[in-house]
Amino acid sequence: MHMTVLFASPRAAHSNTHALLVPFLETWRAAGHTAEVFSLFDLHIEPCRACRGCQMDWEYPACVLADDMPAIFDAVLRSDILLLAAPIHSWFCPAPMKAALDRFVYALNKYYGPRGRGPSLLSGKSLAILTTCGYRPEKGADLFIEGMRRWCRHTDMRYVDALTERHLGYDHTFMDAEKETRARAFARLLMQP
């Protein structure tokens, strides 16, 4: 199985989300699966303009904006599963991920053009979420998770599940053996058909 990971932490390799992603990816790859990781804070991603230029081509994203999204579009279209890996700030994902998600809604869903409703290029793909937050998961990540469930219904994707781990504060160590075990178990869960 091939996975595209959209990683969106402003603290990059020093982040709690990255600490959780490492054992997840080790387990995923050790089982013979592949993953392509995009660190969104390192890329140039313009916000969607809702210009509908992408709606003229029903076979390809065809976004008219010139930035780093074409490589992400291509990777997602080649993937079986999309993993959103991000900290939760203000009850939602950081801005680069939100910008990418908005671009997917238009460029990969041909619902808005002059020819009427076309296909979703994401149809049948799976989506999973790996997040970290400061609140209890049911109060910190719940709105983002619900938003992504609705996003999956809109895009005709299959929502699989989410792993959310809590950080108790900068004076506490985030990563521990229990979190690592849950990250590895989450990778194994996503390997199931």
Predicted regions and their residues:
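Beta-strand-loop-alpha "switch" segments that mediate conformational coupling across diverse proteins
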Residues: D161-R166
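A generic structural signal for alpha->beta connector loops
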Residues: G32-T34, Y60, G124, D156-Y159
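N-terminal beta1-alpha1-beta2 submodule of the flavodoxin-like/Rossmannoid cofactor-binding fold
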Residues: M1-N109, P114, Y170-P193
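Short coil-to-beta-strand
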Residues: M1-M3, M157-V160
